[in-house]
């Protein structure tokens, strides 16, 4: 089936010529389009090429986790994305049943954020927006920001040297060739990634995990069978017709994921419309159900991570850098967050306020996140049932995914719903990865704060649950960078901590506090996008604010300084008078916190410094790789 909406009008006109641009983005799916939006917000000229004629038209990859939505909030896209997702705004739970007809089923959980506890940590929340609805919104924003987006344009070849990359692209509509000379190339070209393969970058991980076929269909009577059960995904467990059912509009459009076993000689061609319709009827439990098949897309779940995210002037992002089990909807979210990490670093280097070595920290920071996240996703896949997934027994236990055959198959995508809210007894279903496949849902939040102060309770169980159950909020929001463009981080700190700890530690996502700037109410996270930011106390004459002005001018670095507190002269006033901004960031009122443009803490000083400008200059130089 044609899975892209035609937007080939963006292809370059004219004959052979050389086009010069700071950044060339290869791939125009979620990660490529997000990269374009983030670069556009930072004023970085770029060209994006995508071989397909337009954006995805297949409903898949629906799970956008809270960190992704925070990023989209700062980028100005969140309101439009939520409008595009309005149809499924009231769908929250994961249901499991032998069949839907005549069986109430068992709710694995009914709410993504029971009790609304997520608001303590974030101004945003999860959003179910399928890829076919999300990509057009990103495309519109990227275009409005001045992005040069060329759909229907294929990368034919590229050569990288020490000064940049020379690429040859071809309009698939006209056959015309264009030479593009870029300072950097971002490869968001999917799990098969010709760019990665040409560079000879290998991959680690067990490989393919399982295969499904995503079937889109229409059924007017199915809504009556479903009734008021507003699930994100329903796992149907009849041993002769298992599968995962997902609503597209809660009325007549649906997606069903059926197991596919190519290792047994089964082909995609075996999935005829008649076979698919019969399977769906058996799974639903209604032999007379009206089923009109409208599309089919094979996909696989895999666990692979590139051994390097950078080769000179070329950087990998999204599925070209990592594939992971669909459990928890980590794949596309991790890719979008790759793009966010990379965009500010490219801007800093291209604009001359950071050293070129800053780009090395992209691999240093993001690859361990993908490794830890993919391992956690595989762990949850062992815990949760999914059609076609049967992890082999591993002698001696092993780790998540150990013993899984590492095939060379390529495909993409993943279905599913959110991982369940930990600590509440509800395991979650799988969420989507980033390529063609089924829609994914968000991971559920951790359980209530335990006695020790960390969400999800004590160290005996994972966050958000005991024993093998692990919460997802610490994975989606609490991951950190023990090494990279940070100063003072503990290199022994796990990338994914056992609990959610957003208290201002270097390498972690900065805390969220509601503040007032004049008449405007905003989250502190809204401050972080196009510059470094220094927070200090408005009532303490420690010299941090003046030091920031001196460093910004002397080093020619975009560095904004905000004095926080209820005192006269404060730039930011906490919305709640009881809020202690310094304590929330792990410092005293005499200290300071430096936050990066991506909202991660670069460094903090617990208290005053004898020479704050000298200290800050040294820290900024280290963070930005300034020799």
Curated annotation (Swiss-Prot):
FAD binds at residues 22-51, 309-319. It is an enzyme of class 1 (oxidoreductase). It comes from the Bacteria. Its EC number is 1.14.13.-. The keyword Calcium does not apply. Gene3D superfamilies: 3.40.30.120, D-Amino Acid Oxidase, subunit A, domain 2 (3.30.9.10), FAD/NAD(P)-binding domain (3.50.50.60). InterPro entries: FAD-bd, FAD/NAD-bd_sf, RIFMO-like. Residues 370-469 are annotated as: Disordered. Belongs to the PheA/TfdB FAD monooxygenase family. This is Putative polyketide hydroxylase. It comes from Streptomyces coelicolor (strain ATCC BAA-471 / A3(2) / M145).
